[in-house]
Amino acid sequence: MPIDFLQPADIVAPQLLGCTLTHGGVGIRITEVEAYLDSTDEAAHTYRGKTPRNAAMFGPGGHMYVYISYGIHRAGNIVCGPEGTGQGVLLRAGEVVSGESIAQSRRGEGIPHARLAQGPGNFGQALGLEISDNHASVFGPSFLISDRVETPEIVRGPRIGISKNTEALLRFWIPNDPTVSGRRGYPKE
């Protein structure tokens, strides 16, 4: 069943697990995501309102919000909710299921399969995300989101690497999947 991206991010996020996002010759099965809510979520890029940088997050659901993280990594979110609400789902980790040689060339030779798209920056690099992909629809022509084949077990916990709204259980992942990023002190199981 297709995902309704006009729903709130915390509803869409677990539905994305097991789906495949394809772009730039690479398909990645999504294994870990984080929901970022509207302007009430202090950890969201939209917390202080609309800016030129985060404008895509205020667009219609089902579009990409691509930004540069730590000055070098391109990270991607799928915008959710009605237009103007500023919600999205951060793509944290996944398994490369097609175009592995392309993903490997983007990430560097010798990166183990499970780590090719492990972490938001690596996910973006393996997928070939560019700032020019900001606002692009996940329904084509340059992106394609495929429904999941089966519904995986899903675990919910706190988001990683944020300092605000840390108690919110808005990180979702497939337990025991080797591609889940985790971080010291955060569960992967």
UniProtKB/Swiss-Prot annotation:
Which InterPro entries does its entry note?
Formyl_transferase-like_C_sf, MPG, MPG_sf
A GO MF term: alkylbase DNA N-glycosylase activity
Q: What's a GO biological-process term for it?
A: base-excision repair
* Gene3D superfamilies associated with the record: Methylpurine-DNA glycosylase (MPG)
Q: What class of enzyme is it?
A: hydrolase
Which Enzyme Commission number(s) are on file for it?
3.2.2.-
Q: Which UniProt keywords apply?
A: DNA damage, DNA repair, Hydrolase
The similarity annotation says: Belongs to the DNA glycosylase MPG family.
Q: Which PANTHER family match?
A: DNA-3-METHYLADENINE GLYCOSYLASE (PTHR10429:SF0)
> Know the name of this protein?
Putative 3-methyladenine DNA glycosylase
Q: Which organism is it from?
A: Corynebacterium glutamicum (strain ATCC 13032 / DSM 20300 / JCM 1318 / BCRC 11384 / CCUG 27702 / LMG 3730 / NBRC 12168 / NCIMB 10025 / NRRL B-2784 / 534)
* Lineage summary: Bacteria, Bacillati, Actinomycetota, Actinomycetes, Mycobacteriales
Q: Which gene encodes it?
A: mag
